[in-house]
Structure formats: structure tokens, C-alpha cells
Amino acid sequence: MPGVRQIDPLLNVLRDTITGMVRRNGPDLSARQFAVFLICYLESGPHTVRGLASRLAVSRPVVTRLMDRMEELDLARRVPDPRDRRSVLIDRTSPGDELLTDIVSLVGDASRHPMHASDAVVRLRGRE
């Protein structure tokens, strides 16, 4: 396939990062949960269920279920919107900040050393 070779390095980084996340026995996030996590942690907020639903092109009940799981994992929490009591805001948590730090390390390691993301996992496990 033309053009696939140009993408291979990025796919390798993605593969190695996800493999590293699985090996470190971190939270098991679906693609949608991971998307919500990254939006909330990498983009300035405030974030709302309505806004996330719009951004992901899914219904609000879908985002509500995603948030239920994120709260179970202590990766995010819903807090009342002080400006609109009918709405909630999505807030970050310390465990979520730690997970983001781990992901950044795994991505960096996978970028610098393709196929060696497991080295980052060993390093991260030493911090636990």
C-alpha cells in the first residue's frame, strides 16, 4: 500500500505505548475512555458531559457511562458547575495525573527506542 511505510513509525509508537500500558497492569481503558481521558488531561477545560459528547460524536448517556468508569478508576470526577447547577464539570484527579505522567514516559520511550517500551514499564514499576 502506498504511503503506509510513512505511517509505520507512528503506528509502532502507538503499538509500543499501548503494549507498555498493558504490561504495567494499569487501568484497562477502552478507546472511548482513553479519548475522554486525553481530552480532559491535555486540553484546557472546563469539560462538560455535553461538550465531550459533542466532541466525540456520541450521546450524553454514552459519556455518562464513560465517566462512571473513569470515576471507578479514580481517573476523573464529576463536580457541580458553580455557574449552572444542572450541569457538571469533569475534574482531574491525582491518580489521573500520575497515569498521564506514565503515558508520557511510555510514549517518549517508544519514540526513542521502538520495540523497547517494556524498558519504560520496568522503570515505571519501580516507582509503584
Task: Please tell me what each predicted stretch does.
Residues 32, 60, 112-116:
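Surface-exposed, interaction-prone regions with an acidic/low-complexity signature
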Residues 46-88:
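Canonical helix-turn-helix DNA-binding module
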Residues 16, 35-38, 65-71:
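Generic structural signal for well-ordered, non-membrane alpha-helices
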Residues 82-103:
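Basic, amphipathic "hinge/linker" alpha-helix immediately C-terminal to the N-terminal HTH DNA-binding motif
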Residues 19-59:
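N-terminal helix-turn-helix DNA-binding core of bacterial DNA-binding proteins
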Residues 1-28, 126-128:
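N-terminal leader segment of winged-helix/HTH proteins
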Residues 17, 21, 101-128:
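Amphipathic alpha-helical dimerization/coiled-coil segments
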